[in-house]
Curated annotation (Swiss-Prot):
Species this protein is from: Klebsiella pneumoniae subsp. pneumoniae (strain ATCC 700721 / MGH 78578)
A cellular-component GO term for this protein: cytosol
Family matches, as InterPro entries: RNaseH-like_sf (IPR012337), YqgF (IPR005227), YqgF/RNaseH-like_dom (IPR006641), YqgF/RNaseH-like_dom_sf (IPR037027)
GO MF entries: nuclease activity
Disulfide linkage: none
Gene name for this UniProt entry: yqgF
Protein name, UniProt field: Putative pre-16S rRNA nuclease
Top-level lineage group: Bacteria
Similarity annotation: Belongs to the YqgF nuclease family.
Taxonomic lineage from the root: Bacteria, Pseudomonadati, Pseudomonadota, Gammaproteobacteria, Enterobacterales
GO biological process, one term: rRNA 5'-end processing
């Protein structure tokens, strides 16, 4: 087992990406992927999987604050299932409530408004999702 994990913050226009290590329980952002109505370029995802060879992929599960599902929840779950179906990699879904809020706060703290572009926020959210998964699981 490599101890490497990829994290995805699913969105219909942009999908945040992060890579992390279980041993350090830390993650770092990778460039966000463009998506057309939630559909990524699967060749790019394949390249990420080949490059990082993750033990598992963590996909953020968007839930309402009360824990109920929202319309995007099913689409994120479908995205996760497609990754598993196409590439056979282990998939874990992880609650992503407040990940975008935390990501925006961290980016703003380090770079002000200029740091708050869509791709940066999405990949920073993927970092938050992955590190939250590590904290709860290991």
């Amino acid at each position: 087992m490599s101890g490497t994990f990829l994290g995805f913050d699913f969105g219909t226009k942009s999908i945040g990406v992060a890579v992390g290590q279980r041993i350090t329980a830390t993650a770092r952002p990778l460039p966000a992927l463009k998506a057309q109505d939630g559909k990524p370029d699967w060749n790019v995802i394949e390249k990420l999987l080949k490059e990082w060879q993750p033990e598992a992929v963590i996909v953020g599960l968007p839930l309402n604050m009360d824990g109920t599902e929202q319309p995007l929840t099913a689409r994120a779950r479908n995205f996760a299932n497609k990754i598993h179906g196409r590439f056979g990699v282990a998939i874990l879904l992880h609650d992503e409530r407040l990940s975008t809020v935390e990501a925006r706060a961290g980016l703003f703290e380090h770079g002000g408004y200029r740091a708050l572009n869509k791709g940066s926020v999405d990949s920073a959210s993927a970092v938050v999702i992955l590190e939250s998964y590590f904290e709860q699981s290991f």
